[in-house]
């Protein structure tokens, strides 16, 4: 598949996207991110006396047991949230298919740009040079995901102060961030690693 003058492999960049698969993987990613530390105290856990607050009969009031009951202020919470792990499993093959589908959605929209090198010749980070690169491609006003072969501090710091721009090495490439972006800026050397990673 030819995108912006670069030949891309069809089994990675020309896969028919299926919404339910992409939705599944995005939901899985967001679930994995959740802390799950939400917590409330039940009537057994709140700090107050468990003594019956008034006699059962003779007062004219409704029957009550302990002050820790949920109907009192400061009492326990019934069926409240407790700490839990939201993570669940998706097969590796399913995740690879979703990654190929996400990349394909960008390729079909001509939103994939491949560069021979990404600021690798710079000795130190330069935001101005990074912004000029985006302007040259006509994507300076878009949400851009920059994909590098490996972790590259010069590239990361150069793009860091540009709004709506993320930098990820191939090992961190994921469906959520690909779908978030309007355009993908991929380093030439990263393509082979992407092919290795998807490897359907």
Curated annotation (Swiss-Prot):
A single Gene Ontology CC term: ribosome
Span of the signal peptide: none
UniProt keyword list: Ribonucleoprotein, Ribosomal protein, RNA-binding, rRNA-binding
GO biological process: translation
SUPFAM superfamilies in the record: Ribosomal protein L4
Source taxon at top rank: Bacteria
MF terms (GO), sorted A to Z: rRNA binding; structural constituent of ribosome
Pfam families: Ribosomal_L4
Family: Belongs to the universal ribosomal protein uL4 family.
Assembly, per entry: Part of the 50S ribosomal subunit.
Alphabetized NCBIfam families for the sequence: rplD_bact
Main function: One of the primary rRNA binding proteins, this protein initially binds near the 5'-end of the 23S rRNA. It is important during the early stages of 50S assembly. It makes multiple contacts with different domains of the 23S rRNA in the assembled 50S subunit and ribosome.
PANTHER family assigned to the protein according to its UniProt record, in alphabetical order: 50S RIBOSOMAL PROTEIN L4 (PTHR10746), LARGE RIBOSOMAL SUBUNIT PROTEIN UL4M (PTHR10746:SF6)
Protein name according to UniProt: Large ribosomal subunit protein uL4
Organism: Hydrogenobaculum sp. (strain Y04AAS1)
